[in-house]
Amino acid sequence: MKEIGALQAEYPLVNKLIATKEVFWINPHIEKYERAIKDSPLNEENVKDAEERLKRFAPYIAKVFPETKGTNGIIESPLVKIPSMKEALETNYKQTILGELLLKCDSHLPISGSIKARGGIYEVLKHAEQLALQHGMLTEEDDYSILDSDTCREFFSKYSIAVGSTGNLGLSIGIMSANLGFNVTVHMSADAKEWKKSLLRSKGVNVIEYEDDYSKAVEEGRRQADADPSCYFVDDENSHDLFLGYSVAASRLQKQLEELEVVVDEDHPLFVYLPCGVGGGPGGVAFGLKLLYKDNVHCFFAEPTHSPCMLLGLMTGLHDKIAVQDIGIDNVTDADGLAVGRPSGFVGKTMEPFLSGNYTVNDEELYRLLKELADTENIYLEPSALAGMIGPVKVCKEDEYLQKQQLTEKVKKGTHIVWGTGGSMVPKDVMNEYYRKGLELTI
């Protein structure tokens, strides 16, 4: 790896990252969709396969999780207009947001209340399906609700699943695995919230705590799983299945946009702002959206100023060969879901030609935005889920991207979607504390 001095000389923005200042970075490696997709390790067929698998599991999900009955076992979240929040953002940041502002409420996804309910649950279901098919417990033509039986639970109890997590991925994998009957262990980093650990333990999940950060929890989880042939490790840093589970969100969003009569085409661009930790969730969603909307969708990742791992990896081209700690950043943030020091190399390399840009936001801003959204729209998100909310302001204010892409006029007829990644399962007293912090910082 290059010396810090060499990185600073080659990439002046690194200086602002080191100083934990907010930055806005336009990806110089973005390519036209038709060119980018040719070199992609994944394609439309992979996403369709994931979509079909989730449909096969829908009867099981509807039976085991009654809160999904209304959507027939499809785990999906609302897409809502937030005009009052848009007004507040314009007033507070003295910046007109051109186009309409919507919020994708993955914070209110059933089962585990975060975007991780997409990828995490999907990967567990795929593993369960493979085991059940191999051992003659199931055929693809069966009604998958038969998996909700003592016989199947007893069968799955011979196997275990492990994952390393800062919290939300652990919740979705823990809850799903335990329901199927797997023995499940979640390796949790120091920044994982206490209530998330307690909730997992209450579901019968084995939680192992570390005093180190996320990368260490993943490393330990991987090591322990390698030593046990019956253990399946969900590898958040390298998993194609997690990524594809997230990417299914795109076709669902397309239907919701149609229902809201929102047009996305060359004259009506779509901008999507996704909070980013190790990269799987935002990467998968953005990839799915690019497959559908090609060059008419513009995806931006959002990271905390103290954990800008994906931005650092993409900007320097070093991907997972560099961690924020290597340039003296502490990776300590209240945005626990985004507290990742080293990005996924697989996601970074896959998304490099598709991603429009990346920006950072400080913790205090997240709390202010949390309070503002609660006041204006009565929607409560956890701090990390607000990272996307400042995106439309940044894109409109620093209009270099709009100019480069010849969008300065088109953006007026465009749509901005902020991906609200988590929050509905946060205990009331914890959420009140978040709100209080936002209030103190606003006064």
UniProtKB/Swiss-Prot annotation:
The keyword Lyase belongs to this UniProt entry's keyword annotation: yes
InterPro entries linked: D_Ser_am_lyase, Ser/Thr_Dehydratase, Ser/Thr_deHydtase_PyrdxlP-BS, TrpB-like_PALP, TrpB-like_PALP_sf
HAMAP family given in the database record: D_Ser_dehydrat (MF_01030)
Names of the cofactor(s): pyridoxal 5'-phosphate
Annotated PROSITE patterns: DEHYDRATASE_SER_THR
Reaction(s) this enzyme catalyzes, per UniProt: D-serine = pyruvate + NH4(+)
Keywords associated with the record: Lyase, Pyridoxal phosphate
A Pfam family recorded for this sequence: PALP
GO BP annotations, alphabetical order: D-serine catabolic process; isoleucine biosynthetic process
PANTHER family recorded: D-SERINE DEHYDRATASE, THREONINE DEHYDRATASE, MITOCHONDRIAL-RELATED
The protein, known as: Probable D-serine dehydratase
Residues with PTM N6-(pyridoxal phosphate)lysine: K116
EC number, UniProt record: 4.3.1.18
Family, as annotated: Belongs to the serine/threonine dehydratase family. DsdA subfamily.
Gene giving rise to this polypeptide: dsdA
GO MF term set: D-serine ammonia-lyase activity; hydro-lyase activity; pyridoxal phosphate binding
Enzyme kind, highest EC tier: lyase
Disulfide bond residue pairs: none
